[in-house]
Amino acid sequence: MLLIPAIDLKDGQCVRLKQGDMDQATVFSEDPAAMARHWVNQGARRLHLVDLNGAFVGKPRNEAAIKAIIAEVGDEIPVQLGGGIRDLNTIERWLDDGLSYVIIGTAAVKNPGFLKDACSAFGGHIIVGLDAKDGKVATDGWSKLTGHEVADLARKYEDYGVEAIIYTDIGRDGMLQGINIDATVKLAQSMSIPVIASGGLSNLADIDNLCAVENEGVEGVICGRAIYSGDLNFTDAQARADKLSNGE
């Protein structure tokens, strides 16, 4: 079970939002590269970056901070990025700059042809982020709710050749209410590609619950507010996950 620290970027700073609300941002660091180094030193084996400004305007906005993170840790662990990735040129540029994966969210829903082209051109590097509330997909930085069912879209994207699905339960994100295990497992069981859980991770019990369903196709979890607030010690959590994954 891969625990993936999230670094959410707004105006060049590392922040956390509550339920995707840009007006409810808590700044945790003004030096995102130092934050990336911190998580690698704590044992992180992958990092999850989100360009929050980019997600809202539809093009990259925190480029300096992202490049600084890649320069700091990109040679050591994979780094994935979502937010504002809406065209093939942007994907190519980020992969050339050293990202391992790009995450396509809104554009996958609104422009499936683009996602198909991205998978063809950059196979093995494309992850889709599906953000949902009550099983329905949301887009545009969570500001618009669609009528699409998560599972229907995810299976379509699997056919396109995406590497994995990151499934976020919007209602739980940043609220420390626990991962929506049932919905995550249900999605993972309906496809053969890995699902990465997101939204609501709060304590070691969540880690236990996730590891219990790892064999169902839940490969990892994005760690957000809990590891910044101190509710969850990242090193302890990854050690526990490793132990459980090894059947100990």
Swiss-Prot record:
<keyword id="KW-0963">Cytoplasm</keyword>
<feature type="active site" description="Proton donor">
    <location>
        <position position="131"/>
    </location>
</feature>
<dbReference type="InterPro" id="IPR006062">
    <property type="entry name" value="His_biosynth"/>
</dbReference>
<dbReference type="Pfam" id="PF00977">
    <property type="entry name" value="His_biosynth"/>
</dbReference>
<dbReference type="GO" id="GO:0003949">
    <property type="term" value="F:1-(5-phosphoribosyl)-5-[(5-phosphoribosylamino)methylideneamino]imidazole-4-carboxamide isomerase activity"/>
</dbReference>
<dbReference type="GO" id="GO:0005737">
    <property type="term" value="C:cytoplasm"/>
</dbReference>
<comment type="similarity">
    <text>Belongs to the HisA/HisF family.</text>
</comment>
<keyword id="KW-0413">Isomerase</keyword>
<keyword id="KW-0368">Histidine biosynthesis</keyword>
<dbReference type="GO" id="GO:0000105">
    <property type="term" value="P:L-histidine biosynthetic process"/>
</dbReference>
<protein>
    <recommendedName>
        <fullName>1-(5-phosphoribosyl)-5-[(5-phosphoribosylamino)methylideneamino] imidazole-4-carboxamide isomerase</fullName>
        <ecNumber>5.3.1.16</ecNumber>
    </recommendedName>
</protein>
<dbReference type="InterPro" id="IPR013785">
    <property type="entry name" value="Aldolase_TIM"/>
</dbReference>
<comment type="pathway">
    <text>Amino-acid biosynthesis; L-histidine biosynthesis; L-histidine from 5-phospho-alpha-D-ribose 1-diphosphate: step 4/9.</text>
</comment>
<dbReference type="GO" id="GO:0000162">
    <property type="term" value="P:L-tryptophan biosynthetic process"/>
</dbReference>
<keyword id="KW-0028">Amino-acid biosynthesis</keyword>
<dbReference type="InterPro" id="IPR044524">
    <property type="entry name" value="Isoase_HisA-like"/>
</dbReference>
<feature type="active site" description="Proton acceptor">
    <location>
        <position position="8"/>
    </location>
</feature>
<dbReference type="InterPro" id="IPR006063">
    <property type="entry name" value="HisA_bact_arch"/>
</dbReference>
<dbReference type="InterPro" id="IPR011060">
    <property type="entry name" value="RibuloseP-bd_barrel"/>
</dbReference>
<dbReference type="InterPro" id="IPR023016">
    <property type="entry name" value="Isoase_HisA-like_bact"/>
</dbReference>
